[in-house]
């Protein structure tokens, strides 16, 4: 019926079941209890680990019907499709620049606001771009 009676106390996001809420709450705890046996990289959820493991197997079962490029996850294929449609629905209110992805707009906005929304859970250092945080995380 669309009811979502289970609410996260950290961010107020609601869920239809307690198990979905529990899975979500791992995001806030930062505890990465799932480890890849190939490279020792750690993940918050089992599903994230399983998706990552396709990097090692090279498995790419989701194929773009436009260009034939393969992806390891359905979500990656959907994200890829904008390359072919040219759709850029996200517009910067500050300068009018348009983006295909919401996250690209969020990252771009940091240039105007000097925001640093990407925060290291290990030491608290913040970054304006996700890739800078990812590079930093390798130093821990």
From Swiss-Prot:
State where it is primarily located. Answer: nucleus
Which keywords are on file for this protein?
Answer: DNA-binding, Metal-binding, Nucleus, Repeat, Transcription, Transcription regulation, Zinc, Zinc-finger
Span-the-membrane segments of this chain are none
Question: Has keyword Iron?
Answer: no
Entry's localization field: Nucleus
ZnF locations on chain (C2H2-type): 6-28, 34-56, 62-84, 90-112, 118-140
GO aspect biological process, one term: regulation of transcription by RNA polymerase II
Keyword Transcription regulation listed? The answer is yes
Checking SMART domains in the record gives: ZnF_C2H2
Q: Could you state one GO cellular component term attached to this entry?
A: nucleus
**Entries under InterPro entries matching the protein:** Ikaros_C2H2-ZF, Znf_C2H2_sf, Znf_C2H2_type
* Taxonomic superkingdom: Eukaryota
One Gene Ontology term of the molecular function aspect: DNA-binding transcription factor activity
Give the similarity note: Belongs to the krueppel C2H2-type zinc-finger protein family.
Query: What's this chain's function?
Result: May be involved in transcriptional regulation.
**Can you name this protein?**
Oocyte zinc finger protein XlCOF15
């Amino acid at each position: 019926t669309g009811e979502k009676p289970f609410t996260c106390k950290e961010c107020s996001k609601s869920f239809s079941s307690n198990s979905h809420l529990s899975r979500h709450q791992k995001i806030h705890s930062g505890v990465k209890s799932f480890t890849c046996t190939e490279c020792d990289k750690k993940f918050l959820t089992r599903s994230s680990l399983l998706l990552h493991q396709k990097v090692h197997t090279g498995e790419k079962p989701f194929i773009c019907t436009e260009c034939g490029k393969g992806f390891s996850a359905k979500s990656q294929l959907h994200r890829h499709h904008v390359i072919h449609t040219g759709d850029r629905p996200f517009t910067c209110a500050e300068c009018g620049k348009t983006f295909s992805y919401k996250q690209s707009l969020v990252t771009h906005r940091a240039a105007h606001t000097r925001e640093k929304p990407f925060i290291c859970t290990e030491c608290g250092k913040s970054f304006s771009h996700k890739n800078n945080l990812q590079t930093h995380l390798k130093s821990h």
